[in-house]
Design a protein with these regions (language model features):
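Class I S-adenosyl-L-methionine-dependent methyltransferase catalytic core
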Residues: 1-228
Length: 228
């Protein structure tokens, strides 16, 4: 069954998100969970500050709100977690993983490249110009090793950056080959066959603001809206 669910696209309320996720899961358990939370950045004064102008167009959640999400209720006894985290928030990502009941094991690095294959230097960063993002990998339960393809899968992906915050589609094939299903994506930006999708952009991801030339608005849609 393909699962689709949408939060009301407004400023997120932690209690609403918690109950919404509980309702969505409804007793189901997933063998692999992919999450791309709307992390909240702070500037050097400690005030909430977008890392980039485009971030102002997205609602974000505080670290405490992300940690409170009942992800453990969606996890099978043996489960893999793939958790996206910006470089600057790596400690927060590890903290979230622990709060959700998973043990950190490894990571996969996404290298954002230009059309010519060079590093895409349009990223941001106070100390260095970021051209990578981190996909943390954690497990829960016994005998939670990756499937056979994972033994030869390198922990690296490279692809062109598209609209803001969108992650590479290569992630899905990697996860499907290395982890057992059923599969669940949290804070999803599209529907995919064999995956449950939860998030306020889960039906589609078409930006209505100027963005990179190779964004998905210029592509044939990858996902169709499928209701349970």
């Amino acid at each position: 069954v393909y699962i689709h669910h949408m939060l009301v696209p407004s400023e997120p309320q932690p209690n609403d998100a918690i109950e919404d996720l509980r309702t969505f899961v409804a007793g189901r358990r997933f063998g692999a969970i992919l999450a791309d939370p709307p992390w909240q950045f702070q500037n050097r004064t400690g005030k909430v500050a977008p890392e980039h102008r485009r971030l102002a167009r997205y609602s974000t959640l505080a670290l405490s709100q992300i940690k409170e999400l009942p992800v453990a209720h969606a996890a099978a006894p043996v489960c893999h977690l793939y958790l996206w985290v910006p470089n600057a928030l790596l400690p927060d990502g590890l903290e979230v993983m622990k709060s959700w009941g998973f043990h950190y094991k490894s990571n996969i690095i996404w290298h954002k490249i230009r059309k010519d294959g060079g590093s895409d230097g349009r990223g941001v960063g106070f100390y260095f110009r970021n051209v990578t993002e981190i996909l943390l990998f954690g497990v829960r339960g016994k005998h939670a090793r990756t499937l056979a393809p994972g033994r030869t899968q390198v922990n690296y992906m490279s692809s062109r950056k598209r609209e803001h915050s969108r992650k590479p589609d290569e992630q899905y094939q990697l996860i499907e080959s290395c982890s057992k299903g059923p599969f669940l994506e949290l804070f999803a930006r599209g529907n995919r066959a064999k995956w449950g999708s939860w998030g306020n952009q889960a039906d589609q991801y078409i930006p209505d603001w100027p963005t990179y030339s190779n964004h998905s608005q210029n592509e044939t849609p990858l996902f169709s809206k499928v209701l349970q």
